[in-house]
């Protein structure tokens, strides 16, 4: 059996410059907020995701797609550049309490064999981390996910995202990110996708210290995501995180959020978003070169 490794989703430099288009109801809300006619149809999301894959995958080492809105269409339309690997989201988002993702389970409809036949090289699992929920349940889900990936020769990517506790109102996001890393940073996955400390804001030295604390608890390669980080701050966030030990990024919003809802999205993705992704890829290569 052909077993993929993280080297199959990196750039030649060994760094990760990966694009996410697997947002689901959150993307629908972004279109609605941008003034798209309500209700925002599934086809609006699918078209945007497929167009993003076509326009941006030549500049990404991998692209993360979701089963619900674009995996089949991306495969059928050969939307992903040959130089770019495909990652498929293996998480099912369960809405509740007024938010689009209140809990997450492994998507039982996932077919790893088919994904591999379609050119997929990795799966991704979102793990919601709350201090007052059962750690063992999270660890068991990650273990099952890792086995699902590795038994089919696919790379396992976990994405712990912290949330306020179900009960009580005390929430220290920064400490929660560290606590999640302590719990899941040595869980047997191949790659850890993490929220940027301090939302990428503040003095560089503070960001670096926070990123180094994170690095101390993650015993596998790690990359940052861009949700909640101002897109103008994201290039710096990549530099700082990589100085601390990260190996790149897996991000969507910092690349394409600014064109959601604009006309001519194929053109916008090519003219506005592709240069951003190219620049981020250059930063990853530059930071990896410093390690040699």
UniProtKB/Swiss-Prot annotation:
Q: Which GO terms describe its biological process?
A: 6-sulfoquinovose(1-) catabolic process
Q: What class of enzyme is it?
A: lyase
Q: Write out the entry's keywords from A to Z.
A: Carbohydrate metabolism, Lyase, Schiff base
User: What's the EC number here?
Assistant: 4.1.2.57
Which reaction is the catalytic activity of this chain?
A: 6-deoxy-6-sulfo-D-fructose 1-phosphate = (2S)-3-sulfolactaldehyde + dihydroxyacetone phosphate
UniProt GO MF annotations: 6-deoxy-6-sulfofructose-1-phosphate aldolase activity
Q: Where is the active site?
A: 193 (schiff-base intermediate with substrate)
Hey, which family's this protein in? Belongs to the aldolase LacD family.
Q: What does this protein do?
A: Cleaves 6-deoxy-6-sulfo-D-fructose 1-phosphate (SFP) to form dihydroxyacetone phosphate (DHAP) and 3-sulfolactaldehyde (SLA).
Quaternary context: Homotetramer.
Name recorded for this polypeptide: Sulfofructosephosphate aldolase
Organism of derivation = Shigella flexneri
């Amino acid at each position: 059996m052909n077993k993929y490794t993280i080297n199959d989703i990196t750039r030649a430099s060994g760094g990760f410059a990966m694009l996410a288009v697997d947002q689901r109801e959150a993307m629908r809300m972004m279109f609605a907020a941008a003034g798209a006619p309500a209700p925002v149809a599934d086809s609006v999301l699918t078209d945007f995701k497929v167009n993003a894959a076509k326009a941006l995958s030549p500049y990404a080492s991998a692209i993360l797609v979701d089963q619900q809105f674009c995996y089949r269409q991306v495969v059928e339309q050969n939307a992903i550049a040959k130089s770019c690997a495909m990652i498929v989201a293996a998480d099912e988002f369960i809405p509740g309490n007024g938010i689009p993702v209140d809990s997450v389970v492994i998507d039982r409809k996932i077919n790893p064999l088919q994904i591999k036949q379609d050119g997929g090289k990795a799966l991704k699992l979102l793990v919601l981390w709350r201090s007052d929920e059962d750690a063992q349940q999270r660890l068991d889900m990650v273990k099952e996910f890792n086995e699902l990936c590795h038994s089919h020769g696919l790379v396992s990517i976990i994405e712990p995202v912290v949330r306020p506790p179900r009960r009580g109102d005390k929430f220290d996001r920064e400490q929660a990110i560290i606590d999640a890393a302590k719990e899941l940073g040595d869980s047997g996955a191949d790659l850890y996708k993490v929220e940027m400390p301090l939302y990428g804001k503040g003095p560089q030295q503070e960001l670096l210290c926070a990123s180094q604390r994170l690095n101390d608890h993650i015993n596998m390669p790690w990359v940052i995501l861009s949700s909640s980080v101002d897109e103008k701050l994201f290039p710096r966030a990549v530099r700082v995180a990589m100085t601390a030990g990260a190996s790149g990024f897996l991000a969507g919003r910092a690349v394409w959020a600014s064109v959601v809802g604009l006309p001519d999205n194929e053109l916008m993705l090519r003219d506005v978003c592709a240069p951003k992704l190219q620049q981020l890829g250059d930063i990853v290569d530059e930071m990896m070169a410093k390690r040699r």
